[in-house]
Amino acid sequence: MNITVLCIGKMKEPYWREASKEYEKRLSKYCNLIITELKEGPSPLKEGEDILKRLREDDFVIALDMKGQPLTSEGLARRIENLGIEGKSKVVLIIGGSDGLSQDVLGRANLQISFSTLTFPHQMIRIFLLEQLYRSFKIIKGETYHK
C-alpha cells in the first residue's frame, strides 16, 4: 500500500522530527510512506488549493478534521485493510494547518476522520496519525503491540 501524508507546515522541533522518523522506520515494513510538508498559507483556502493540486483522481483521500467520524484503533485498521482488499493502493491522509482544511479539500475527501474534538498542534497530530497507522498495520497482521 502507498500512503502519503500531506501536512501543512513543517516540524521544526527536533523531538517531533525524531518521533516522526521512528514511526516512518517502523511503517516501512508495512507500506510505502511519503510525508509531504506544504507551506503554510495565508488562509485555509490557499492551503487547500496547494493540497488539491497534489491529489490524483485515483487517490483515496482521508481528511483529518475535528468534525470527522471518530474511529477506534480497530476501526481505522479495518478501514485500511478494506481499502487494500478493494484495490485502493493509493491512500492520502491530509492534516490541515492551524485554521483547519478548506471546504474544497473536505469535499474532495472520501472519508473524514477525527482523532478528537480537542484542538492539537499539527505536529502532534502527525505523530498521533503515524502511531495509529503503525498500530493499524500491527492489528491487520495480528502482531502484538503494547497498549
Give each language-model segment a name:
Residues 6, 36, 62, 111-113:
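Hydrophobic/aromatic beta-strand patches that form the interior of the parallel beta-sheet core
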Residues 9-14, 40-42, 67-68, 119:
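Short histidine/acidic/glycine/proline-rich micro-motifs that form metal-
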Residues 31-91:
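S-adenosyl-L-methionine/SAH cofactor-binding core of RNA-modifying enzymes
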Residues 96:
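Rossmann-fold NAD(P)-binding glycine/threonine-rich loop
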Residues 100-104:
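Short, glycine/polar-rich helix-capping loops at beta-to-alpha or helix-loop-helix junctions
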Residues 105-147:
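Structured adenosyl-cofactor binding patch, chiefly the S-adenosyl-L-methionine
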